[in-house]
Amino acid sequence: MALTGLARDTIARRLQHLQSVRDRVVIDADTHPSSPALYSDALRRRLAADPNYFHGRPISGEELLRDMDHAGVDMALCWQNPAAITYTDDPRENFAALRAANVAIAELAQRNPTRVIPAGWTDPKALGEDEAAQLVQLCVEEWGFPIVKMNPAQNRFPIDSPVVLRMVDRIVALGAVPAFHFGADTAFTPAEGLRTVALRHPEWPVIGVHMGGGGPAYVEGEPLYQAARALGLSCPNIFFVLSAKRDTHMESDLITYRLAGPPFAHNIAVASDAPYGRISWNFGGFRAMFATLRDGAAHGDPRLRANPGLFDNAAVHDFMGRNLADLVIRTDLRLLRSPAAAEHEVAAGEAHADGDQGEGDGEQDSTEGGEHLEVAGFAKVVEQHCHGAGVGADQEDCRG
Ligand SMILES: [Zn+2]
């Protein structure tokens, strides 16, 4: 299988849009819209009977877009809402349910290509390894998703299980970015577990959603909050999404990573975790927090008073949208230039965009089983992107 025409068009359109807005876009990097057509009867009855919020209470794509408008958010990274689907004991039924939820995300992105960045979701535990791998392939090659997530907490499996690492290998081999719920709400995602995942493909990005938050009790969450902050500084390929985490720790994360400079200052994006959090509340809070960070001389953090200009407009914009935009841009460029994409072009008899489809600098990445994966040259693609954007070849120079 190779990228379908739909996937190629989806990726190309998204890439063009993100390249045109990266210097001003505001992105919510963690949202979970659902299709009401997929709600179970029980969920439908509960929604009709109870207007109050309950954990994970689903919102439709249209509701999400309205909330984004209210909050001044241009785009959202969207994956399915695990609270809106029901698993059974039958892995095939679970595959069908999760497939349908991913299709709903793909269709939402098709309808709103300038608002929605679609991301996939797979689950090796509920689906079984083969079906979970099949879903990864559909997410990337059929629907053109740049990111595929697993949730070790809600789906209940250790983040560094062998089967999870094999799923990471598959996502990477397809050219996409693996993402994980990474929180202190369960014991399934310790910092060492995410480190194992990150070291599996050290030149490849991996996304840790919640940066150690995710809804633990405040005191219980403290050790992972601290460990996550340190982990990212030792693994430059980890990209963190700041959502569902104490605001005080989020502020410290932002100051720490801004002080650390590139690449770390480019490895964080802010988010709401809607519908688990409100977009308006979170982005209202982020904007207010950044206003105080901009006023470094008057800030309570001594690191800021010593570096009062640390949070200039460019720094704030990085965290509010550009960091994630650039991660998706790099990924989309890689997907369009992947061996799978080249295969599709040959099959369709299309001319190559240029003569450089060989990926001659692809890395050899050994896996536990001794098998080798050909992966596209990440650094090379970054260089291409920078040239395309009319700035220097150095990755750090890419950034405003
Ligand atoms: Zn989330």
Describe the predicted segments one by one.
Residues 1-27, 38-75, 263-267, 277-348:
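Mid-to-C-terminal alpha-helical segments outside catalytic/metal-binding sites
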Residues 30-36, 181, 210:
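Histidine-centered divalent metal-coordination motifs
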Residues 30, 68, 105, 148, ...:
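Conserved, mostly hydrophobic/aromatic
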Residues 45-91, 115-123, 146-147, 153:
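Divalent metal-dependent hydrolysis catalytic cores, especially in the metallo-beta-lactamase
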Residues 341-400:
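Short, strongly patterned local motifs
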Residues 4-7, 145-147, 156-270, 274-279:
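Catalytic pocket-lining loop regions of alpha/beta-barrel enzymes
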